[in-house]
Amino acid sequence: MKKPTTYLLFLLPVIVFTACTHPATSTVSLLSYIDTRVGTAASVTKTAGMFGKHTEEYGQTIPAVLEPNGMNFWTPQTQDTELKCIAPYYYRDSLFQGFRNSHWISGGCTQDYGSMTLMPLAGKLSCTPEKRATLFTHDSEEATPAYYSVYLPHEQIQAEMTGRSRSAIFRFTYGKEGDAYLVVNPNSDEGEGYIEVDTIHKRIYGYNPIHRIYQGWGEPAGYSGHFIIEYQKSISDFGMFRNDSLYPQQTNIRLGKGIGAYIRFHVEANEQVVVKAASSFTDKEGAIRNLTDEIPHWDFDLTRKELTEIWEHHLAGIEIETTDTVAKQKFYGALYRASFLPRTFNDTDGRYPSFASGSPIRQLAQGKTYYEDYSMWDTYRALHPLINLLHPSKGGDMMQSLVYKYEEGGWLPIFPCWNSYTAAMIGDHCIAALGDAYIKGIRNFDIQKAYEAMRKNAFEHPASEEDYKNGMGRRALDSYLKYGYIPLEDSVPDAFHTNEQVSRTLEYAYDDFVLAQVARLLDKTKDYEQLSSRAKNYRNVIDPRTGYAQGRHADGTFLNETNAFSFNHFITEGAPCHYTWYVPQDPYGLMECMGGPDRYIAKLDSMFSQHRYWHGNEPCHQVAFMFNYAGQPWKTQKAVRHIMETEYVNAPGGLSGNDDAGQMSAWYVFAALGFYPVCPGTPYYALASPSFETAVLHIENGNTFRLVAHHASKENIYIQDAVLNGKPYTRNYITHEDIIKGGTMVFIMGDKPNKKWGAAASDCPPRILE
């Protein structure tokens, strides 16, 4: 091979020509690359079972029909509960129970809420999910983001589903003449649901009250999931049921587990019956309005066409060129899964229930959206940065929704889900998301009110212990401020995740860093200085004897145990070797704590050579990119490509752990493009190994950013040289501004590492925290 510089100069004319050439428009639907069932089975990746157990070995995704960040995830159901950690659908199951308007935190281990399930039947009426469940095969399924269908052989029904954000339309084709039924459950595990049949207006209405988990577990959230179902066909009978007991001609039923409604109608062979449904978190009228506004007709194919066009436009925000079909499937499947959350929470007229109480009903300004379900411990890392990059207006609305939560509840939430405080997981990462948005130039949210909220979390403890126990404020903030770390003596009792003192310290230090960057931009000098000092608190839990994170007592002594490779109560969901790398704000300071770059690299190497890297959980997600900071970006390129090939498979068991609201998938989107936001709240992305011949990002401001990787392949994973907008480029990072102002970045890829490219200290990401 020629020397890299000579090779680069030789290719400059080709690079310039490529930058001016646009790929031919593909006639292949981008939806055709997506199987929405990826992540619904136990993991089959190479590290499956090494770290995670039970539901941690599943992607915990669902094959949902939805609009990007829509309200409802319309999914087939094989599990009939809303209980924690049980997804509505698993690929292992062979019995179909119906269609659900799910509010599952996709890819997580939390709970569904406010849902209902409807099921078409033929011949015999069976009401409970267990009794009516009918065999199906995965070969008979078609599962895309805009359309789902399945054949139910026992019922001889072809069942199809498509929809919009808050509504859905179903088409059932009956293979034989006779009686047919529609059975509906309000899915209240607490036995608090209600349902009624309105034969005059041909509607079924009901509601399912929502309950909290984590802080305030089991308490009412103050609002319900209201649903409406409309049918066209004349019915011959209707009634209610409670488990196996039928109540013919009864118009409503409330309270108690296992309740529901049914209607009966006669069908001819091959007759198609169309049913519509919608939901609302406000009231019955909201559900009706949502259905009327989104699907005012009975044309199934028209709705399918509308949703297909929405998805095609959304996915085309990133165009890729590659001859590798599997790579396209993995990429667009990841982009689909990164488009679930946060979810739209308001009705079409802008109404939504108040945060943390459910009342009063609030009213948004026209054109605005209120979002909910922020799995923030996961998603601030890559999902929110991806939204901020591709859809900054939507990202701003998501941040303003956090501001509304502060205004309505009194505190910025930690992990806002089911429109409630939870204090689930650790850290204070709404700060990270808000800071990342503002630092990257997003301005369509109230930064002054946001700063007030963030600062309150960082400096104040709730005056009311009841509020604290209810999930408001940072856990163990008093200890953190007193010691500069959270000592082992503070067990953090008022939290779902107790203890985990070291992980909390590391995460608070990062959050303080991000808040400091916002303070600097807002000229809050005193806050900036104090928070910048606190951002170095990570040093207080790195044991100088080992260079690994370690538990520390109130008297300043570290634990004597030095096994950095075993799970421990002071670490969140992992071992010290995993969390040691959680210093995204100051990798250079971490090098100093470890004894210099050589020891830093040795420890980083061991994460991969000793199989300690755990991609199935978030604390490791930035680890592979941290070689860049030590001037060895070729190791980042190697590690990231290895993770992409081994931890993601285009199969039902294709995720190595919980997708966690799209974080796992957002990681893949960034990695496949060749850059990653190691430290959200800064404008820098670490470069990795671009995997496509061409990728085009269509920025919301009208600009396009093209990434061209000559000779990219599964073997040619190493950057030999790079050019940005016609000029040689040696930095191993790129800025947010470089991308959004548009341009072209060209890489020359090879099968051997160029250890000189990006290796100089001046080519590494800037050190911000001095």
Predicted regions and their residues:
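Extracellular attachment/recognition segments
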Residues: 718
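Accessory carbohydrate-recognition regions in carbohydrate-active enzymes
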Residues: 24-384, 388-432, 438-506, 514-540, ...
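Bacterial N-terminal signal peptides that target proteins for export
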Residues: 1-8
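Beta-strand-rich recognition domains
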Residues: 706-711
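ATP-dependent phospho-/nucleotidyl transfer catalytic cores
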Residues: 511
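C-terminal motif of bacterial Sec signal peptides marking the signal peptidase cleavage site
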Residues: 18-19
